[in-house]
Amino acid sequence: EIKRLKLSKYIKLLGQNDNILQVMNGIDIYVQSSSYGEGFPNVVAESMACGTPCIVTDVGDASFIVGKTGWVVPPNSPNKLAQAIEKALYEIGTKKWSKRCNKARSRMREKFDISKMLKSYNKLWYQVHKKK
């Protein structure tokens, strides 16, 4: 379909790759179109940590991870997914895009920093243990 629509210049399907940092730093947008059960999709967090905005379907924790830094669309909604991709493509290279990239990276530091998460879990465990 990519070839038929003459989009090969713009879209690359990479498959499995061991050098995530290099890949994430080399892409403009990460799109995750899942229709069921992703739990905590690590690749979304990895993308955002590299400053790559994400377009995700509202499955598992994807919408929580992305927050307002990217786009969240309903699962099994190809038209809405296409609209989100189109919006992102028009935004690339603008000041708004730069802010979006920075917000994605900042959200990872604020919400998913391992030391902050450990403190939060410890606090929760302490509260649960205290109630017993």
Where are these regions (language model features)?
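Conserved acidic donor-binding segment of nucleotide-sugar-dependent glycosyltransferases
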Residues: W71-N79, A88-G93
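Active-site donor-binding acidic/aromatic loop of nucleotide-activated sugar
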Residues: S8-N17, V23, V72
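A short hydrophobic beta-strand element within the catalytic core of glycosyltransferases
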Residues: V31-Q32
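Short alpha-helical segment that forms part of, or immediately flanks, the ligand-binding pocket
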Residues: L21, G39-A49, S63-F64
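A charged, aromatic-enriched C-terminal amphipathic alpha-helix characteristic of glycosyltransferases
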Residues: K96-Q127
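Short, structured helix-loop element that forms part of the nucleotide-activated donor/catalytic region
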Residues: E1-S8
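Short hydrophobic beta-strand element within catalytic cores of glycosyltransferases
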Residues: P53-V56
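Short acidic/histidine- and often glycine-rich active-site loop of Leloir-type glycosyltransferases
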Residues: D58-V72
